[in-house]
């Protein structure tokens, strides 16, 4: 159960990293994104596909470019992560109160 959560966190981290580079360096291709991020090209390609399906980036002949939705999402993301972090912390505290931890 928790390994799935850890995998999802890593996936979100990768997608967010790729999106950040697209916003900062657009237009940018897979090879350059791979070099900058340290992720292999096949993982970058997958992240780009996910981001495109979320309408956060769009392809161009020169490489990926961010949509207007991407900048809004990047501003929204830290607050959402803090909210989720608090929920997990509260879950842990509830288990402590019940004597599970």
List the model feature ranges, each with a label.
Residues 38-53:
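Short amphipathic alpha-helical interaction segments
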Residues 32-35:
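A short acidic, leucine-rich amphipathic alpha-helix
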Residues 76-101:
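Amphipathic alpha-helical dimerization/coiled-coil segments
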Residues 20-24:
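Short, locally clustered residues in the helix-turn-helix/winged-helix DNA-binding domain
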Residues 52-62:
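A short, conserved structural fragment
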Residues 25-29:
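Short capping segments at the starts of secondary-structure elements
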Residues 62-78:
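Basic, amphipathic "hinge/linker" alpha-helix immediately C-terminal to the N-terminal HTH DNA-binding motif
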Residues 1-18:
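Short alpha-helical segments that sit at the start of domains
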């Amino acid at each position: 159960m928790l390994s799935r959560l850890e995998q999802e966190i890593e996936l979100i981290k990768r997608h967010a990293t790729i999106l950040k580079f697209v916003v900062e360096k657009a237009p940018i291709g897979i090879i350059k994104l791979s070099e900058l991020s340290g992720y292999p090209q096949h993982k970058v390609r997958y992240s780009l596909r996910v981001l495109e399906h979320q309408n956060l980036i769009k392809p161009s002949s020169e490489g990926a470019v961010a949509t207007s939705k991407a900048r809004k999402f990047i501003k929204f993301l830290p607050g959402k992560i803090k909210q989720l972090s608090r929920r997990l912390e509260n879950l842990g505290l509830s288990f402590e109160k019940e004597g599970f931890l």
